[in-house]
Regions:
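NTP/phosphate- and nucleic-acid-binding module
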Residues: 1-469
Length: 469
């Protein structure tokens, strides 16, 4: 069986044509890099979030959950430095007026350069010295000096719009956890180490979003802030790196498509003791960041304690000490990892039938836990619809089930393969029997496996346990 080399265009086309992802506001011409998750996409993305929460909250003995507000007291973002310093390096092409991120221009032309370690002045000098760095729009090498572009979306609370009503859409979910540290520790009576996990929307006014859902201005994060005793942080840092990678592997990402990249000292945020990115080999780039795992020390809690005047210290009853915990942060983009799962699962298989005829089967080899539908019920004839719908209605009490009675059974199989449905259940005349023809009902159905295309006959009563196994 031969396989085609996958491209981002293939995946985007499947998503648009099969209801995974649509362009946002499409009837009005769309909105740059805005995407809506369709009927299949919302089930798929919800399954990604459920799988993450199951692993990081339900199965973890350390973690609890939180759902903090998107709009926070603006002092939060002043304290963290986001208002003053959360910015990208913006420059303009003098020739065509197009705006670009300076770090992206450098990185695209000189991938060997560690752009993250460069200051704005160093980027300016590098671009001036390298005439091969040109405007992607017009091809000219004529840029303005770099200036800061703040990434936060500003809004106003209340009926008046002045400086006193200014608020921001959160650029990250982490701060909602930090400001609730004392509340969570008090109400759960947790002892260190423990973590707080959150899934939620964040917003960044990116200069150059792109590559489908990889980088967007509105996105969803799945973050854990893990609080531990100072001095144990590097041990927990290693623990969470392994934990995160193993979660990806357990859901079908191949190990050779992942790499762990440690940040060099010059790349680290000034408060960070260590940071490692888990990167994925996307089809549109060599490596793209999926997960950032950082040792943030006690920086965030210390800053919030100083600014608010409220104690965020932890009392260690074993050592009789008060201290501010260190924090390990595994931060994952939900949209980004969902795209990685789609890229990993997508396949175009070149098949040859018994007569030598060639065909291409498009299939999403999604892990069953992530697939929008766990199975599809397909009556061989519309006359069998009543029994087929009865089976569908029973199974749908436990998981999402598709129902399709249109077209040949072969075409229906292919449609389900393309959207990633792990099993197809075919209801035939042997299932219900036919007294006139002397056929006794066997109350069995044929179950086809998406990945192997093999079929087995089994009693209807065993379907639920088989699909859930």
């Amino acid at each position: 069986m031969e396989q085609s080399e996958k491209t981002l265009d293939m995946i985007v086309n499947l998503c648009k044509n099969r209801g995974y992802v649509f362009p946002g506001s499409e009837i009005y011409g769309g909105l740059a890099n805005s995407w809506d998750y369709g009927p299949l996409g919302v089930e798929f993305k919800n399954n990604v979030k459920k799988a993450w929460l199951k692993k990081f909250v339900q199965e973890s003995p350390y973690n609890v959950g939180l759902d903090a507000a998107i709009i926070m007291n603006p002092q939060t973002w002043i304290t963290t430095g986001h208002v003053a310093g959360f910015s990208d390096p913006l420059l303009d092409c003098r020739a065509c007026k197009a705006r670009h991120r300076a770090d992206k221009l450098i990185g695209d032309e000189h991938p060997e350069v560690n752009v993250d370690a460069m200051s704005f002045d160093e980027m300016d000098a590098f671009i001036a010295e390298h005439e091969d760095i040109v405007c992607p729009v017009c091809g000219k090498h004529d840029f303005t000096p770099i200036r800061k572009f703040n990434l936060m979306f500003k809004t106003a609370i209340g009926v008046t719009e002045d400086s006193s009503s200014t608020c921001y859409l959160r650029p990250e979910t982490a701060q909602g956890i930090f400001v609730n540290f004392a509340n969570i520790q008090r109400t759960t009576r947790r002892k260190l180490p423990f973590g707080v996990c959150q899934v939620g929307k964040a917003f960044r006014n990116e200069i150059t979003p792109g590559n489908f859902t990889f980088r967007t201005r509105e996105f969803e994060q799945m973050e854990c802030e893990f609080f531990c005793k100072p001095g144990t942080d590097l041990e927990w840092f290693a623990y969470w790196k392994d934990y995160c990678e193993n979660w990806l592997l357990s859901l079908g990402i191949k190990k050779e498509h992942l790499r762990l990249r440690d940040h060099e000292p010059a790349e680290l945020a000034f408060y960070s003791r260590a940071t490692t990115d888990i990167e994925y080999a996307f089809p549109f780039t060599d490596w793209g960041e999926l997960w950032g795992i950082a040792d943030r020390t006690n920086y965030d809690l210390t800053r919030h304690q100083e600014a608010s005047g409220k104690s965020l210290e932890y009392f260690d009853s074993e050592t009789n000490e008060h201290y501010i915990p260190y924090v390990i942060e595994p931060s994952l983009g939900c949209d980004r990892v969902a795209l990685a799962f789609l890229c990993e699962a997508y396949d175009e298989e070149h098949l040859t039938d018994s007569k030598g005829k060639e065909d291409i089967r498009t299939v999403l080899h999604l892990h069953p836990a992530l697939a929008p539908y766990k199975c599809a019920v397909l009556p061989l004839s519309k006359k069998l619809g009543e029994k087929a719908m009865e089976i569908r209605n029973e199974l749908s009490k436990y998981f999402m089930v598709d129902y399709d009675d249109t077209g040949s059974i072969g075409k229906r199989y292919r449609r389900e393969d393309e959207i990633g449905t792990p099993y197809c259940i075919t209801v035939d005349f042997d299932t219900v029997g036919d007294e006139a023809k002397g056929i006794t009902a066997d109350n069995c159905v044929t179950v086809r496996d998406r990945d192997t295309m093999e079929q087995v006959r089994m009693p209807i009563s065993e379907l639920k346990s088989y699909i859930e196994s």
